[in-house]
């Protein structure tokens, strides 16, 4: 079975791009190859994930298909979640941000759908939140 997590950003109540440079900086060491649909990530422990992202569309939200248990993935995601207005969410679950002050930047619809986002202190905490849902 496939599982996806989604990362989007909002600004002034509307969808906004996550700077591509920030996404590339977080995932860069783990990008095995790029293709038009996204990036294959490969981690030191053998874990692999696919990031669906369109580099040329200017939107720069993304989803991670079959997120690996590799700690490097979750640390990279937390780095991205520190961008104001950025939130990670998953089907049937909740929403996570990287800092309490960032909740104010989110679209109101996020809280309506998922409830108040939880602040993750480290990548392992994101994994635990997903596993509990």
Per-range role (PLM):
Residues 1-133:
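Acidic (Asp/Glu-rich) sequence patches and key acidic residues
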């Amino acid at each position: 079975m496939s599982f996806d997590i989604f990362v989007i950003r909002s600004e002034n109540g509307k969808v906004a791009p996550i700077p591509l440079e920030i996404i590339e900086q977080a995932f860069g060491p783990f990008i095995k190859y790029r293709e038009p649909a996204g990036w294959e990530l490969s981690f030191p422990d053998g874990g692999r994930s696919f990031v669906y992202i369109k580099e040329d569309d200017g939107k720069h939200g993304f989803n991670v298909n079959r997120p690996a248990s590799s700690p490097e993935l979750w640390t990279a995601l937390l780095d991205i979640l520190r961008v104001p207005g950025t939130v990670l969410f998953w089907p049937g679950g909740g929403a996570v941000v990287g800092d309490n002050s960032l909740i104010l930047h989110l679209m109101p619809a996020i809280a309506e759908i998922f409830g108040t986002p939880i602040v993750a202190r480290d990548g392992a905490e994101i994994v635990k939140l997903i596993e509990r849902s």
